[in-house]
Amino acid sequence: MATATTLSPADAEKLNNLKSAVAGLNQISENEKSGFINLVGRYLSGEAQHIDWSKIQTPTDEVVVPYDKLAPLSEDPAETKKLLDKLVVLKLNGGLGTTMGCTGPKSVIEVRNGLTFLDLIVKQIEALNAKFGCSVPLLLMNSFNTHDDTLKIVEKYANSNIDIHTFNQSQYPRLVTEDFAPLPCKGNSGKDGWYPPGHGDVFPSLMNSGKLDALLAKGKEYVFVANSDNLGAIVDLKILNHLILNKNEYCMEVTPKTLADVKGGTLISYEGKVQLLEIAQVPDEHVNEFKSIEKFKIFNTNNLWVNLSAIKRLVEADALKMEIIPNPKEVDGVKVLQLETAAGAAIKFFDRAIGANVPRSRFLPVKATSDLLLVQSDLYTLTDEGYVIRNPARSNPSNPSIELGPEFKKVANFLGRFKSIPSIIDLDSLKVTGDVWFGSGVTLKGKVTVAAKSGVKLEIPDGAVIANKDINGPEDI
């Protein structure tokens, strides 16, 4: 922990005042209070690590292992069961669906055939447990924003063959930038006074909740952590098997960058360790180089495989000092700061940590309604086991780029504007602006733009086939 000796007198006083104020916040546990003060102390001591650009090396295939070089899997179902008995699946479930106009946890947005993200996750694990006679548990890490709703939602899975456990990530007070006081002490006692400190918090929260010890007692060895909105983040035994054989304590799945991913974090070799390099850590003069697909060819999918005993060892030693991400916000006109950490940045603290360079199919996030259009279309199919699989009929390995105007931003509006989702198997790009409505059975091919003039409602008729066209009015269809 940052002590007064590493701080200027002014910062030491700031931290002491903050300690006194936080001590009186009864909404949070002692673990949360000390975790928060620890984080702020590190932030004030300015321990942010500066990257020496000349020391960055491209990781070798030993460090970032190509997927096809992973150890081969046994075909024996008994061996598969042995592997699965060591596994826990953890989904990061702290996010709300607000950016897509939904209330409640993002994981309950319907993805396809009336099934939500959470329904699909449960189906997948149910199928594994049934097929191999194993018992892979599902853990959901909620935030205080999603906890109550999630408890109600998981009741519907009471009859499934899965143990579902929920726990909360930490709840920290937002800091008022002006005087470094906790926002809840300023009379803002509602949810706006607090924040969840990023998914780097998964490790201490797993420990503090008691879940980590309970899992270790059941003989579990590895946790597969992924965002609940990544439809490609399914259990992969090849990765798990490789980690167990090679005693790798941590594995980050990376995949080749496309132009859409230039801001994503990448893995580098730095002073003999593999570590995550995020755009925020890159000196200004090197940002364009960081974004180049030539030099930094891979990016972090946030699918992580981590050894449970190693998490316990490092959390107990207070060794997981990930880079702090300062996230400035404004609440009711008051400038506040929230300090966060990312789970991927923990890679450098684990022994024999590696990356696995996986196929792009393992990264299928739904961040906006444009992504929802992709996964609800004929570009993908849904299997009985809950897997969203790309349609082999599409010859182009990359997905079409889709830009929808603000009229489509909310899920309800998006669904209302499509009588049915168009066929996009041969689409390269789609850009839609203005008050546009799609009929049923529409087919889009090549490069298509649809732009309704201001104040004009533009309807694409049922059954229309539009190939390589710019449509600005009914006469263009």
UniProtKB/Swiss-Prot annotation:
Positions of substrate binding: G94, G95, H199, N227, S228, D229
Effect in UniProt of substituting K263Q: Significant decreased Vmax values
Outcome of swapping K329Q: Increased Km, Vmax like wild-type
Catalytic activity: alpha-D-glucose 1-phosphate + UTP + H(+) = UDP-alpha-D-glucose + diphosphate
Primary location group: cytoplasm
Enzyme Commission number: 2.7.7.9
Keyword Kinase: no
N-acetylalanine: residues bearing it: A2
Keywords: Acetylation, Cytoplasm, Magnesium, Nucleotidyltransferase, Transferase
Record GO cellular component, one term: cytoplasm
UniProt entry tagged with the keyword Metal-binding: no
Source superkingdom: Eukaryota
Residue positions binding UTP: L92, N93, G94, G95, K106, Q169, G198, D229, K367
Impact after mutating T5A: In strain: cv. Desiree, cv. ND860-2 and cv. Russet Burbank-1
One Pfam short name: UDPGP
Outcome reported for the amino acid change (mutating K410Q): Activity almost like wild-type
Function: Plays a central role as a glucosyl donor in cellular metabolic pathways.
Assembly description: Monomer.
Protein name: UTP--glucose-1-phosphate uridylyltransferase
Organism annotation: Solanum tuberosum
Lineage of origin: Eukaryota, Viridiplantae, Streptophyta, Embryophyta, Tracheophyta
